[in-house]
Amino acid sequence: MKLKIGCFQLALKKTDNFELIINKINNFLSKNSVDMIILSELAVGGPGAKNERFYLNNYIDKFSDIALKNNIWLIPGTFYEKLENKIFNVAPVINNSGQLVTKAYKMFPWLPYEENVEMGNQFCTFEYPGFGNIGIHICYDLWFPESSRQLSLSGSIAIVNPTLTPTKDRDIETIMVRATAAQQQLYYIDINSTGDQGNGLSIISDPCGEVIHKSADSEDIFIIEVCSDRVEEVRKEGTYKLGQPIKSFRDHPYFKNSYTMNSEYLDSLGKLKKPD
């Protein structure tokens, strides 16, 4: 199955971007048809974990209405959320019925700079009907390959990463995106902001590490297509019919108890052998 995704690298103010975002979404959907829209990290409110005005509870119903009205899945970037006096950086996933399917909690806040934010303690995936399992990273999570490995072993065939990077290490992150996609044999969708928030360079890589799209540092609203059959082909037959890292990792006895594995999915990839 092919999934058509609208990716929004927006020129954002430091904060208070809700009306701008809604106008951009409405204008885009008046001209285009997609299955899903993805925004960047903290797109609405920007950094500032103690600014309760931009907490998730103030916006979840508004974005749910947008998803329902337009019959799209929506990952509207991330928001801060307070739970039991702890603050987390959270990415909600809303389906085309306007329902909150799941929330991803940022595993690795950008410490020591992302202050007052707790570490998440659970990896997040969701099922897109007919397409398959999609994992969620939030920005700095990309820097920890263990998290990508866990998502791929859980059966994810794509990772979505809402990002807010304004710093000079952005070029390094674009390299990491390609490497992660190739190592985990999946699509990696990394959406940054620009303007007063991020410095752009959003990048999407296919399961062989090839770049599907890379933005410049200006606003860029673009559409990509990802294909579940392509991931299955690469994982079963190898990258360019060569290495099969997912199956090699699956079969290594040392790691059997180190990660939570979706055995049914991993077994469906077949034996580790040379392609016909």
Please annotate each region the language model reported:
Residues 13-97, 103, 166-182, 186-187:
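Cys-nucleophile CN-hydrolase/nitrilase-fold catalytic domain and related Cys-dependent amidase chemistry
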Residues 1-7:
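Extreme N-terminal starter segment of soluble prokaryotic enzymes
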Residues 4, 32-33, 133, 155:
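Short loop/turn motifs at secondary-structure junctions
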Residues 56-75, 143-222:
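CN hydrolase (nitrilase-like) catalytic-core segments centered on the catalytic cysteine
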